[in-house]
């Protein structure tokens, strides 16, 4: 496994996704821009990468209509100097990631330091504001070992598979089931080529980046310990839980 100093020689880039609208929040404001203890949700997510030495550049992928807001009210307002680009996303998550990957390749091709084939790519949901340095360190370490990993937690509840009529059809072994989070971290060349093939094939049924790597390569994706605090803001209840966690930590003035 490479030492942290070796990871820093390569250029590591994070794509932070902020193009979703979040209809389940029942608000006009997209969930990633809602206030969370004095700052927008997305500002917390970006702040975690800003403070993490293992990432050099951040690409923020936004809805086209929100780009100027993100630049002025998020990136500039909170001094997020690692955010090199704010770009428009696609109609689906995987298309937004592909736009981010193409932009990341342009950054790498502009003569930046680091080996041409080296470096790692983080993909993170902007609506996961409580990601912390420990998760980022663990996922980067496992990406160095295995070339592909995702933050994840073992499920707590029994999971049922339903039939088409809504009846329980199967009960998988809970010991084998994990709830997937972000970041998802990959060797840059691996994930770029996997996405390129996926787009070329016209595949559209994709729910996360690990699924693309699983489908298009023979590399196994490592499940890396995330955190139950690393929740995704999807419903009003999630926002209240995130506020509770931040208040307990008493660190929201520091911006992490």
Whereabouts are the PLM-identified features?
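Conserved alpha/beta core of the MobA/IspD/sugar-nucleotide pyrophosphorylase nucleotidyltransferase superfamily
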Residues: 5-7, 177-256
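N-terminal glycine-rich phosphate-binding loop and ensuing alpha1 helix
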Residues: 6-70
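A structural signal for isolated positions on well-ordered beta-strands in alpha/beta enzyme cores
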Residues: 13, 56-59, 85, 122, ...
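Hydrophobic packing residues within well-ordered alpha-helices of enzyme cores
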Residues: 25, 49, 70-74, 139, ...
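Short aromatic/basic micro-patch
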Residues: 35, 130, 171, 185, ...
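Short helix-capping segments at alpha-helix termini
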Residues: 52-54, 76-82
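Conserved donor nucleotide-binding strand/loop of the catalytic core
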Residues: 79-91
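Conserved beta-loop-beta/alpha segment of the NTase-like Rossmann-fold superfamily
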Residues: 91-164, 181, 186
């Amino acid at each position: 496994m490479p030492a942290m100093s070796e990871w820093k020689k390569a250029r590591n880039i994070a794509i932070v996704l902020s193009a979703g609208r979040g209809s389940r929040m029942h608000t006009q404001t997209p969930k990633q821009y809602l206030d969370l203890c004095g700052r927008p949700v997305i500002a917390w997510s970006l702040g975690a990468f800003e403070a993490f030495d293992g990432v050099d550049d951040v690409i923020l992928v936004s809805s086209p209509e929100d780009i100027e807001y993100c630049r002025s009210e998020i990136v500039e307002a909170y001094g997020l100097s690692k955010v090199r680009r704010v770009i428009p996303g696609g109609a689906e998550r995987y298309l937004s990631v592909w736009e981010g990957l193409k932009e990341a390749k342009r950054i790498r091709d502009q003569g930046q330091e680091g080996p041409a084939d080296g470096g790692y790519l983080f993909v993170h949901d902007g609506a996961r504001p409580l990601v912390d340095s420990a998760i980022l360190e663990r996922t980067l370490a496992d990406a160095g070992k295995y070339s592909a990993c995702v933050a994840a937690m073992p499920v707590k509840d029994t999971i049922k598979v339903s039939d088409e009529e809504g009846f329980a059809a199967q009960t998988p072994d809970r010991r084998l089931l994990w709830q997937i989070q972000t970041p998802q971290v990959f060797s840059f060349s691996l994930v770029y080529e996997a996405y390129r093939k996926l787009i070329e094939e016209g595949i559209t049924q994709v729910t996360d980046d690990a699924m693309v790597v699983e489908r298009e390569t023979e590399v196994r994706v490592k499940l890396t310990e995330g955190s139950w605090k690393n929740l995704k803001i999807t419903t009003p209840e999630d926002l209240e839980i995130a506020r509770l966690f931040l208040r307990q930590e008493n660190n929201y003035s520091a911006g992490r």
